[in-house]
Amino acid sequence: MRTNGRGPRDLRNVVLEPGVSKHAEGSCLARFGDTHVLCTASVDEKVPPHVYGTGAGWVTAEYGMLPRSTHERMAREAARGKQGGRTLEIQRLIGRALRAAVDLRALGTRTVTLDCDVIQADGGTRTAAITGGYVALALALRGLQQRKTLSRNPLARSVAAVSVGLVEGEVCVDLDYGEDSTAEVDMNVVATGDGALVEVQGTAEGKPFPRSDLDRMVDAALEAIGRLKERQEQALRG
């Protein structure tokens, strides 16, 4: 039993609350235990230069943490004048993950931007952003279809993400901050709802780990992502 009372394969209490923003075309407040991320989707009727002329659309993401989302106040990146390397890495991950959910040609020559803002952080902010960002994206695309802007929904598949790691030799999913900081191995797994991998990020802390542990962690993550898919479907029905 983990210190927070969960079993090794148990997710934290996951709540995906859709439609929380009055102005955004799609929105979702993703709560994974004490990690809370506000995800909004905005539609722009143009594409970035590298996509212009292809007839396809684009999905991208921005990520940020509120100053007091952590134990001690962080300076806003805007006040420092530039985004940090961690921020850039995470928002690129979110964008890659959510593009895997979309037929970009069916989207047409428009861009959907996901803004993922961490209100409170207790581990797994990037995976919460992807899981909640998918709901916000799906709502935005549904709205375009309902307004007849799109003839068909370009959403091709669901995408979700979860952290997984080795904690005292045990494979555990959805790590909180305390577990993440002491894990022997820490991974983030992004996958479609039918179990196809989109991205796997994994790091050994201290000593290498065998392939068998990698397989066990990926299997546990995919099982958890299957349950997250159900939460996403519930949110989109709500």
UniProtKB/Swiss-Prot annotation:
Keyword Nucleotidyltransferase on entry: yes
GO MF annotation terms: 3'-5'-RNA exonuclease activity; tRNA binding; tRNA nucleotidyltransferase activity
GO terms classed as biological process: rRNA catabolic process; rRNA processing; tRNA processing
The keyword tRNA-binding belongs to this UniProt entry's keyword annotation: yes
InterPro entries associated with the record: ExoRNase_PH_dom1, ExoRNase_PH_dom2, ExoRNase_PH_dom2_sf, PNPase/RNase_PH_dom_sf, Ribosomal_Su5_D2-typ_SF, RNase_PH, RNase_PH_bac-type, RNase_PH_CS
EC annotation from Swiss-Prot or TrEMBL: 2.7.7.56
Signal sequence annotation: none
Binding-site list for phosphate: 86, 124-126
Swiss-Prot/TrEMBL keywords: Nucleotidyltransferase, RNA-binding, rRNA processing, Transferase, tRNA processing, tRNA-binding
Domain of life the protein comes from: Bacteria
Reactions accelerated catalytically: tRNA(n+1) + phosphate = tRNA(n) + a ribonucleoside 5'-diphosphate
Top enzyme category: transferase
Assembly mode: Homohexameric ring arranged as a trimer of dimers.
NCBIfam families noted in UniProt: RNasePH
Protein function: Phosphorolytic 3'-5' exoribonuclease that plays an important role in tRNA 3'-end maturation. Removes nucleotide residues following the 3'-CCA terminus of tRNAs; can also add nucleotides to the ends of RNA molecules by using nucleoside diphosphates as substrates, but this may not be physiologically important. Probably plays a role in initiation of 16S rRNA degradation (leading to ribosome degradation) during starvation.
Family statement: Belongs to the RNase PH family.
Protein name: Ribonuclease PH
